[in-house]
Curated annotation (Swiss-Prot):
Domain of life per record: Bacteria
Molecular function as annotated in GO: ATP binding; ATP hydrolysis activity; sequence-specific DNA binding
Name of the protein described by the UniProt record: Signal-transduction and transcriptional-control protein
A GO BP entry: regulation of DNA-templated transcription
């Protein structure tokens, strides 16, 4: 409020307040001066305000230096925070207790420029006898209250000199200085809000698993988030205000696309000087006239995209060690072996007849390894035409051949990066492709068809075959060097005829699974059918047994499976010569009879019976006791 208040009504109101406060007119100084510890607390609370006000006080004092004035700045309750002025004036004021820490409110110092300006919430000038306390009547005080953006009183600026120096212009100087302080406070608040907003945005962009950067129209990087720096293995200070093409060598192409009004979304790019690919989207920043003023790029590691794709198209391993059914010594040794090598990065070659469960073993290895959270990608080398297997394994770039997809396509190696690649029927791979596969295994990187850049891949290779690869090498169908590269860890999966003791367990397992699948009750199997199940040679191994059990469940315990017209390989573990009477029985009864038959066949030799049944001696004795089986 720009008025010079010297009217008696203002002074009278103030004097009346002072009388009511009980202030004596003859006191030598303000009645309240803060102790050091109290004052230090006040200073800390108003530190930011002092830092803003002090420069304006110094500017104003430079105009008045040597003219007999001093400047005071107080906090919202009238406590003096800082003083600037001519030394002789300050010296006299110190004698009167007008010092830093003095309370200049009306309750402490009577009617004065600071206290009365606070009381009336106005700018005013008080001179001479207008002061309530006599000792202060030698001064003229021009004061203006400082408000924050919301109109709250936060301080006061006061200019004091000898009473004979009173002039209305001095109040104008103070008011102008206060306006400058208030404007600066607004600017500071806006700056703080901008900084806070920037910090919020930084926190948001740093918390997402996406690389984000912003560039101007010249391609100069103006901002980049932490995720981008981590993915590119760079420091923010090394790239800020640098050209983006030092990081992304395809930037000129991106910029041209955007300037031509084309979009640049879900594209695949290569990181400069690195064998790494990213999926990127770039969006233009436009002004109100639709002119491009900059661009924002958002990218992610292409491997994360591949992992997500693999997850949703079920390129994951579902089998674990719990799915490997069997208690025979051969299966126990197999389980121990694959558990011990699961975390090794070395290549694995699984060999075994068709239907023995080679992929089950491969998936179990993956799910027991430190790669279990990554992709398990399988490819059947014998099911893909020779002309396509290279692109399936290594991928291709856009335009590599007629019909190639726009943007190219990753191969199985890239899709399996950081995970496991299962090469089933490796023995069927063409010789020329074996050379390419060997090179990838040796160098750890792939080059897409039509491309010229090598992309690093970290893939655990598990290969499988039902062929005798050593014979294939002799016949010239398989490379010897590839064989040794693949068979760092050889695994042999025994056929079912070598683990007859597991047949009963597998029958029970598949009965439960197939009954659940078909929505049926577990059927009772006729004894003669069960005898055939135990004695049959199972050339198709576990897969053939599984299909046979599904047939039995469908037919409620009977079967259309013709054992006689199939090739049956008999050995010591076959029980086809044993005659069982034709009636119905439970699984427990079947187990009892199977154990009894086995013991009789072995002439009462418990050790031999244990080997055939695939169980240990203590387990067999428990079952002998349970079923009250007589041993000869």
């Amino acid at each position: 409020m720009l008025r010079r208040y010297t009217y008696n009504e203002i002074i009278k109101k103030s004097h009346k307040r002072c009388s009511n406060y009980g202030i004596k007119i003859d006191i030598p100084c303000p009645s309240k001066i803060l102790r050091d510890e109290e004052f230090n607390v006040i200073i800390q609370k108003n530190k930011a305000l002092i830092e803003i006000a002090r420069p304006f006080m110094e500017i104003l004092y430079n105009f008045l230096k040597g003219s007999g004035f001093s400047l005071y700045f107080t906090e919202k309750n009238g406590v003096v925070l800082t003083i600037i002025g001519d030394q002789d004036i300050i010296r006299d004021q110190i004698q009167m207790g007008i010092i830093e820490g003095a309370d200049m409110s009306e309750k402490s110092a009577g009617t004065n420029g600071i206290g009365t300006a606070f009381a009336e919430n106005i700018s005013l000038q008080i001179s001479g006898e207008e002061h309530f306390i006599k000792v202060f009547q030698i001064w003229t005080c021009s004061s203006s209250v400082v408000h924050d953006e919301d109109g709250n009183i936060i301080g006061c600026l006061n200019l004091t000199g000898r009473r004979q120096l009173a002039h209305p212009h001095t109040l104008g100087l103070v008011v102008a200085a206060v306006k400058s302080i208030e404007n600066h406070l607004k600017v500071k608040k806006t700056q703080n809000e901008l900084v806070k907003t920037y910090q919020y945005l930084n926190k948001i962009t740093d918390s997402v698993n996406l690389g984000i950067f912003a560039v101007d129209t010249k391609g100069i990087i103006k901002a980049i988030n932490k995720s981008a720096c981590d993915m590119l293995h760079i420091n923010e200070e090394d790239v800020i205000n640098k050209n983006v093409d030092t990081v992304l060598d395809s930037w000129k192409h991106i910029l041209q696309r955007l300037r031509n009004g084309q979009s640049y979304e879900d594209e695949e790019i290569m990181y400069s000087d690195k064998k790494k690919r990213f999926n990127i989207n770039v969006y233009p920043i436009k002004d109100k006239n639709s002119n491009i003023t900059g661009m924002v790029g958002i990218f992610k590691d292409i491997q994360n995209v591949y992992n997500l794709v693999n997850k949703y198209i079920n390129r994951t391993a579902k089998y674990t060690f719990d799915d490997i059914i069997g208690q025979s010594e051969a299966m126990k040794r197999l389980k121990e072996q694959i558990k011990s090598i699961s975390n090794s990065p070395s290549t694995v070659l699984i060999q075994g007849e068709s239907g023995t469960g080679k992929e089950l073993i491969a998936q179990s290895i993956h799910n027991n390894s430190n790669r279990r959270s990554k992709s398990f990608v399988a490819i059947n080398c014998g099911a893909i035409p020779k002309s396509l297997i290279e692109s399936e394994l290594f991928g291709y770039e856009e335009g590599a051949f007629t019909g190639a997809k726009r943007g190219g396509c990753p191969g199985k190696f890239e899709l399996a990066n950081e995970g496991t690649l299962f090469l089933d029927e490796i023995g069927e791979m063409p010789l020329d492709m074996q050379v390419n596969l060997l090179r990838v295994l040796q160098e750890g990187c792939i080059t897409r068809i039509g491309g010229n850049k090598c992309v690093d891949v970290d893939v655990r290779i598990i290969a499988a075959t039902n062929k005798n690869l050593k014979k294939e090498i002799e016949d010239g169908n398989f490379r010897e060097d590839l064989y040794y590269r693949l068979s760092v860890i050889p695994i042999y999966v025994p056929p079912l005829r070598e683990r007859n003791g597991d047949i009963g367990i597998l029958i029970e397992h598949f009965l439960k699974i197939k009954a659940d699948k078909l929505g049926k009750l577990i059927p009772e199997i006729r004894k003669n059918i069960y005898e055939n199940l135990l004695s049959y040679g199972w050339p198709g191994n576990v897969r053939e047994l599984e299909n046979c059990i599904e047939n039995i469940v469908n037919m409620n315990g009977n079967t259309s499976f013709n054992f006689e017209n199939r090739t049956i390989k008999k050995d010591v573990n076959c029980y086809s010569d044993v005659s069982l009477e034709y009636d119905m029985c439970s699984l427990e009864e079947l187990e009892k009879r199977a154990i009894s038959i086995c013991i009789n066949q072995c002439g009462g030799n418990i050790s031999k019976a244990c080997r055939i049944l695939g169980i240990n001696r203590s387990t067999l004795y428990i079952k002998i006791k349970k079923y009250n089986i007589k041993v000869r």
